[in-house]
Each structure stands twice: as C-alpha cells, then as structure tokens.
Amino acid sequence: MAVKVVTENRRARHEYHILETFEAGLALRGTEVKSLRAGKASLQDSFARVENGELLLYNMHISPYEQGNQFNHEPKRTRRLLMHKYEILRLMGKTREKGLALIPLKVYFKNGLAKIELALAKGKKIYDRREDIASRDARREIDRAIKERMRLH
C-alpha cells in the first residue's frame, strides 16, 4: 500500500484541537490529478462542509496544469469528497455542534487514488496556543539539559 503525500496542512495542528480523523476520496478532473501528482497543491484556508447530503471541500488550491489547454480546471473550485453515506451523516451530526469544523490535514495518493485526511477539530484559543508553545519549549530545555548531562559523563 504505497502512500505518497502531496501536501500537508501544518498550521491545522497548531490552530485546532484534533478530535478525530477521517479518510475521504477526492473527486477530481484530469488536469487536477496531473497537477496533484506534480505536488502543486495547497490546503491553506481550506475547509470541508456537509451540504445537501454531500461532503464538499472549499478553498483548496490546485495549480492549473502547465501542459493543459483551454479545458484546464479552475484552481480554487469546490470539490466533492467521497465517503460512505453513513459516514457523511455522522459527520453532519458532529459538525452541527458549536465550534467544530472539518479541516483537511493532508492530501495523498493511496494505491493510485487521490485521498484526503480530514479532521474533526475545535479551534484553539490564543492562550491554548501559548500553553502549547511553553510546554514545547520546556520539553526542549529538559531534553537539552539531559543531553548535556549525558555528554559530561
């Protein structure tokens, strides 16, 4: 099962508490697949939403394919995500809760098929982010001190 990661949304883990992750297929056009294989995609500011029983992805940027012609795709078009109906209904129920959102974490190819990892997430407050940074810095300091101590012995 070969997995080739195309793009990751690194900011998502900093700005949101990840509660649960899901895998969905991406419904793409031909030139979009070629651009994705070339790694020309961005998940910045993108999000997913359930509308009329369909799971849709907004604001994902896939650059137009360089060798494409006039039938090239629109870079930020709304794309359909493919999941089982019961999974979509479950997500619809969960996203109705206040403060929960569907955030894409990464896009990858799995067995030749374009997939996206979605996260059910809750936005972090500024003080939560500061706490995370402080704990990470403290952990680094401790690791550095242990490493220094080991070097002396």
Swiss-Prot record:
Domain of life per record: Bacteria
Cellular location(s): Cytoplasm
GO biological process, one term: trans-translation
The keyword Cytoplasm is annotated on this UniProt entry: yes
GO cellular component annotations of the record: cytosol
Main subcellular location: cytoplasm
Keywords carried by this UniProt record: Cytoplasm, RNA-binding
Molecular function per GO: RNA binding
Record-linked InterPro entries: SmpB (IPR023620), SsrA-bd_prot (IPR000037), SsrA-bd_prot_CS (IPR020081)
Pfam (any one): SmpB
CDD domains: SmpB
UniProt function note: Required for rescue of stalled ribosomes mediated by trans-translation. Binds to transfer-messenger RNA (tmRNA), required for stable association of tmRNA with ribosomes. tmRNA and SmpB together mimic tRNA shape, replacing the anticodon stem-loop with SmpB. tmRNA is encoded by the ssrA gene; the 2 termini fold to resemble tRNA(Ala) and it encodes a 'tag peptide', a short internal open reading frame. During trans-translation Ala-aminoacylated tmRNA acts like a tRNA, entering the A-site of stalled ribosomes, displacing the stalled mRNA.
Family, per entry: Belongs to the SmpB family.
Record-given protein name: SsrA-binding protein
Originating species: Pelotomaculum thermopropionicum (strain DSM 13744 / JCM 10971 / SI)
